Amino acid sequence: MPSVSKAAAAALSGSPPQTEKPTHYRYLKEFRTEQCPLFSQHKCAQHRPFTCFHWHFLNQRRRRPLRRRDGTFNYSPDVYCSKYNEATGVCPDGDECPYLHRTTGDTERKYHLRYYKTGTCIHETDARGHCVKNGLHCAFAHGPLDLRPPVCDVRELQAQEALQNGQLGGGEGVPDLQPGVLASQAMIEKILSEDPRWQDANFVLGSYKTEQCPKPPRLCRQGYACPHYHNSRDRRRNPRRFQYRSTPCPSVKHGDEWGEPSRCDGGDGCQYCHSRTEQQFHPESTKCNDMRQTGYCPRGPFCAFAHVEKSLGMVNEWGCHDLHLTSPSSTGSGQPGNAKRRDSPAEGGPRGSEQDSKQNHLAVFAAVHPPAPSVSSSVASSLASSAGSGSSSPTALPAPPARALPLGPASSTVEAVLGSALDLHLSNVNIASLEKDLEEQDGHDLGAAGPRSLAGSAPVAIPGSLPRAPSLHSPSSASTSPLGSLSQPLPGPVGSSAMTPPQQPPPLRSEPGTLGSAASSYSPLGLNGVPGSIWDFVSGSFSPSPSPILSAGPPSSSSASPNGAELARVRRQLDEAKRKIRQWEESWQQVKQVCDAWQREAQEAKERARVADSDRQLALQKKEEVEAQVIFQLRAKQCVACRERAHGAVLRPCQHHILCEPCAATAPECPYCKGQPLQW
């Protein structure tokens, strides 16, 4: 890395600092470093929301970053101070503290010489050129002209050069780290050597920030890179034991500030996030944002996000990994490997050798975490795989985990499936493709192939598996229908359906043991604990094609009657489900219209209030001017001596008109000319 060596040499030689643009220099030097003069007078209009250029409270105050002559910073841009009080904004060491203070908005780190405007913002700009997310004071660059090179610490450059030479355990294959991002590398290497469990990605996903740091706060200098939590606001509940969504808890987070998790009455059993750490490192998150933007993560191997594409599959399998491990019959059929490949089709064949190792790692999760598969995460995985979208999108919203619902009777199975899908997000369900599937199914049922399709539709009984419902299948492709992703080929040695006599399927039961074993034997994409392959028909050739059952055998009169009634019943259920979907969509549209109307009314009310306030200020100003004029006129017409009667007498020889007649008769001389010589 020649650039690092040159930069280190330049830093050691004391080369002049780089020239900054005027706007960048102003923010680096003055942003939140001085107290707002208007706030002390209660006149600052940028307090709520807080968008002022200056600080209002001490915990918003930012120290000015400086690079000394020896090439070091006055405070570290990476290692946080453990003695800084985030509530009061006071540090015992004062401004001389060599560590980073976690101010409001993390301004000391974002607006440091090393990080300010060194990365591109992922959000767009509005009509005024301001960031739509961070506003006017966005610390990231919007466009190539807004980028600035980072200012590097000389010790960091030396450590980076040592890492390149292999002195810190990097050796060959070390990525080209950008300047100013190598923080606590020696500590990370030391912890990895002391505790090799942190090298396991699954252990990091489940244990990051879940245990308190064993070191005293003053001895732990990792800060941002420490895999343990130091206070309750930094704590992350173990996702193996607690299931919670990525949505912040309304009792803990008010506005943009996170409060104490003890404010929530639900405690650790709450289904919402209690800290910024729980929200940022949620198991359903995707790729690490630092890796995506800069190609380097300061947390290193302790990061709970995915650093490479191939590890994203484990994140997607978080909510359904126990389905692969709870059934002993899944080891012989080879189905778990196929199911994993269906979960992440974009990873290709090279992942085949890694599935066994990941299976062993996930076995630890299954021993601690009982089989309670997440409904909505399974639906999200199936919908994502059916739409052909990869899992590397950093903006994909993680599906909130829900409780596993018990399997109901056969008459409500379709409603439960569609209800769970609607709980996830209504826009994920392709209504048009569902209607097309129903129309094509009606055409197949009423056409000439209808009686023939019932010849080989008798279900095949598989020992130790859940009985199959012989009646729900979409003739369209699995990638176009929202229910098509639930269809999976049935594994195991099964004979031809033509050799099996017709029989009426037994009713479905919701036994936990049977449900868990059956779900683990088929596919991790089942809804409410039901495997996706339970909706398949068994064709004569046992093909994984999602087309409806069309057997070439002769029509059977014995199986036509019961299956025809069953098909009619399921068709009625689908019509009812489609009607409910339309009702949901209409209700959602109505709510959206009402919300839009409320937003418009709120904006109009704010505009009217602003106009009324400006009119009020203008009216008060005019009133004061009129009152001043009236007072002046009244005083101009009164006698200056008695202040009661109007002046009417003209004094001589000065010709002043300031006294009334009685006062002019008694006054020996003009009050205005008193003490002044008369000009003749």
Swiss-Prot record:
Query: Would I find Nuclease among this entry's keywords?
Result: no
- Report C3H1-type zinc finger ranges: 75-104, 115-145, 243-277, 283-310
Q: Which GO terms describe its cellular component?
A: cytosol; nucleus
Q: What is its EC number?
A: 2.3.2.-
Q: Where is the composition biased (Low complexity)?
A: 326-337, 375-396, 465-497, 545-562
Q: Which GO terms describe its biological process?
A: protein ubiquitination
Tell me if Protein biosynthesis is a UniProt keyword of this record: no
Tell me a Gene Ontology molecular-function term this record carries.
zinc ion binding
According to UniProt, this protein's pathway is: Protein modification; protein ubiquitination
The family classification in the record reads:
Belongs to the unkempt family.
Name of the protein in question: Putative E3 ubiquitin-protein ligase UNKL
